Amino acid sequence: MNTQSDSAGSQGAAATSRTVSIRTLIALIIGSTVGAGIFSIPQNIGSVAGPGAMLIGWLIAGVGMLSVAFVFHVLARRKPHLDSGVYAYARVGLGDYVGFSSAWGYWLGSVIAQVGYATLFFSTLGHYVPLFSQDHPFVSALAVSALTWLVFGVVSRGISQAAFLTTVTTVAKILPLLCFIILVAFLGFSWEKFTVDLWARDGGVGSIFDQVRGIMVYTVWVFIGIEGASVYSRQARSRSDVSRATVIGFVAVLLLLVSISSLSFGVLTQQELAALPDNSMASVLEAVVGPWGAALISLGLCLSVLGAYVSWQMLCAEPLALMAMDGLIPSKIGAINSRGAAWMAQLISTIVIQIFIIIFFLNETTYVSMVQLATNLYLVPYLFSAFYLVMLATRGKGITHPHAGTRFDDSGPEISRRENRKHLIVGLVATVYSVWLFYAAEPQFVLFGAMAMLPGLIPYVWTRIYRGEQVFNRFEIGVVVVLVVAASAGVIGLVNGSLSL
């Protein structure tokens, strides 16, 4: 039996120099959240909903994702010593495997998002450089691969260099978005066009409930990254900066998203928006000011995707490295180079990104399919973190067993009853919202997500047995059963041809 404390890795990681300021944390949140999704949101929403349902959807998403943001805000205050919130909160509260599955899902979602970002990047370039057009998918796949390894070379040089690049690209890409809002609001928005078919009764997109349900996956996709500050909590100069950066980043992104999606419905009808290409914001501005508007937005998209690509390649390696430091997967994966970068975790992430590039290329997978699959995987840590906050607010602790909670410093500041009640409301809203999102998702992507999660059992179980430790607690056994059943259903669907990307 290995008696070494599991918290050693996280605590050791916490001892690293804290160099990331609140401005950089906010830039990381906006940089990783305002990626490809915001540029395709007019077409994404227009394909499934009208302007009325869009407003209802943003109201639900705003409340839901704000509750998710506040979950990480509250947990950062209640457990200020825990690093990489998307991983540590679930592990301390619900068990080692739940923490592992949260980090594994977050990592896989980030990997798939990387491929989606790069695909949209080169498809946008294809409008101006025919070599990268949809007529040359092999060339685009090679270009995506080259970009992936180039970014690996950047992030492997350390946090400070990559974070600086993220800050620069975040500032650069916000400018075209602000130009879009100003130009459309004053030159192109028509209230009559916005209200002519408010509920899309002529668009063939179903009932209002179906429309709201349909846009949920896209609203989540464009908000993913809101937890970015908590992931990099161990590099923050101050733990209070983590909480403040999360809220500031959320409000900024929400204002951008609501403005862009609402203004688009005042320029083109729901049917016209649905027919646009992935870079639909460029087409909307082109309809207002001409071709130069499309070029401006395309430039912003390229800068946006580049910044998000760097951010997510940084973010996805972090939980993988911490799991290795904490003994949930082989410790060599957590190797740190002389520049302070988790180079082995970044290398493995880059290799897996390359594998998905090949898989998606062979299956001719669309950008929208990548979005839906990645979104379902991101929901795993959101759900478990929200559930942990509910447990803290109701019983003051998570599930206690020999391999969760007791090996961590589970202490925290004193919380008043009044604050606890507020935290319970936040946790319940975030939990219900996360469950609703799984319901709103298309079933095939839930099953594909389960199949992607299942292989993670191999390194986890092997490492636990090697260390002579208990593999699962009772709650985790239930999680594994659900995972195996869903993955089995997915495999059966693939075999009989009823399931495909």
UniProtKB/Swiss-Prot annotation:
Location, primary (coarse class): membrane
Keywords in UniProt for this one? Amino-acid transport, Cell membrane, Membrane, Transmembrane, Transmembrane helix, Transport
According to its UniProt entry, this protein's organism is Corynebacterium glutamicum (strain ATCC 13032 / DSM 20300 / JCM 1318 / BCRC 11384 / CCUG 27702 / LMG 3730 / NBRC 12168 / NCIMB 10025 / NRRL B-2784 / 534)
Please describe what this protein does.
Answer: Permease that is involved in the transport across the membrane of lysine.
Location of this chain's protein in the cell: Cell membrane
**Protein's UniProt name:** L-lysine transport protein
List the membrane topology term(s).
Answer: Multi-pass membrane protein
Q: Which domain of life is it from?
A: Bacteria
Report the PANTHER family cross-referenced here.
Answer: AMINO ACID TRANSPORTER-RELATED, ARGININE_ORNITHINE ANTIPORTER-RELATED
Could you state a single Gene Ontology molecular function term?
transmembrane transporter activity
Q: Name one GO cellular component term.
A: plasma membrane
Q: Family assignment?
A: Belongs to the amino acid-polyamine-organocation (APC) superfamily. Basic amino acid/polyamine antiporter (APA) (TC 2.A.3.2) family.
> Which residue ranges traverse the bilayer?
25-41, 52-76, 92-113, 138-155, 174-191, 214-232, 247-269, 292-316, 340-362, 377-393, 424-440, 447-463, 477-495
GO process terms (BP): amino acid transport
